[in-house]
């Protein structure tokens, strides 16, 4: 019984983690409110690939990655 609960708990957290990543990748790019000019990557769901945008440094959303590789790993499902 304990092992069943442990497996169920692990599966639940995997599902929540996957759903969270999926939702993150569906968000539009968001430059934020800062005045900086950092090149970042976001997943463009329409184009099905990671693209660059200029991030202001403050705020924004979670569809914001330091590298294209990070963006591809989280969102592109192997085709990037």
UniProtKB/Swiss-Prot annotation:
Ranges where the BPTI/Kunitz inhibitor domain occurs: 25-75
Cited Pfam families: Kunitz_BPTI
Signal peptide: 1-21
Top-level lineage group: Eukaryota
Keyword match Manganese: no
Substitution effect: residue 33 to A: 1.8-fold decrease in trypsin inhibitory activity
PROSITE patterns for this protein: BPTI_KUNITZ_2
GO cellular component: extracellular region; extracellular space; host cell membrane
A single GO molecular function term of this UniProt record: potassium channel regulator activity
Gene3D superfamilies: Pancreatic trypsin inhibitor Kunitz domain
Cysteine disulfide partners in this protein: 25-75, 50-71, 72-80
Main location: secreted
Tissue-specificity statement: Expressed by the venom gland.
Biological function: Serine protease inhibitor that inhibits trypsin at a molar ratio of 1:1 (Ki=160 nM). Is thermostable.
Miscellaneous section: Negative results: has no effect on chymotrypsin and elastase. Shows weak inhibitory activity on mKv1.3/KCNA3 potassium channel currents (1 uM inhibits 50% of currents).
Protein name per its UniProtKB record: Kunitz-type serine protease inhibitor LmKTT-1b
